[in-house]
């Protein structure tokens, strides 16, 4: 049984993205830049390195106002060259 995300969420709502990418200094800036375009705000993402240090996990929470915003951000964050996965 498939459940649509928009049926589970009531907007506006806090929504956290977890972005995994290469451990490069520009990763956080690129993630925040994309988020700012679709959900302007003051963000302080949490960054955690992988066990071997090759990747970083960037967690960032937005105040989502509609499902299209959530879906667009998944798509746009995934287009960043150094990003490997968006959860």
Curated annotation (Swiss-Prot):
Cellular component, GO annotation: cytosol
Record InterPro entries: UPF0250_YbeD-like, YbeD-like_sf
Its domain of life?
Bacteria
**What are its GO biological-process terms?**
cellular response to heat
Q: Where is the signal peptide?
A: none
Xref: NCBIfam families:
PRK04998.1
Family note: Belongs to the UPF0250 family.
HAMAP family registered for this protein in UniProt: UPF0250
User: Which PANTHER family does this UniProt record tie to the protein?
Assistant: UPF0250 PROTEIN YBED
Tell me the protein's name: UPF0250 protein YbeD
Source organism of the structure: Escherichia coli (strain K12)
Question: Lineage of the source organism?
Answer: Bacteria, Pseudomonadati, Pseudomonadota, Gammaproteobacteria, Enterobacterales
């Amino acid at each position: 049984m498939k459940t649509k995300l928009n049926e589970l969420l009531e907007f506006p709502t806090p929504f956290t993205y977890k972005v995994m990418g290469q451990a490069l200094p520009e990763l956080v800036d690129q993630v925040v830049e994309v988020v700012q375009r679709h959900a302007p705000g003051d963000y302080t993402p949490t960054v955690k390195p992988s066990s071997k240090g090759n990747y970083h996990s960037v967690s960032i929470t937005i105040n989502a106002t509609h499902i299209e915003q959530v879906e667009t951000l998944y798509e746009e964050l995934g287009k960043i060259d150094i990003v490997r996965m968006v959860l």
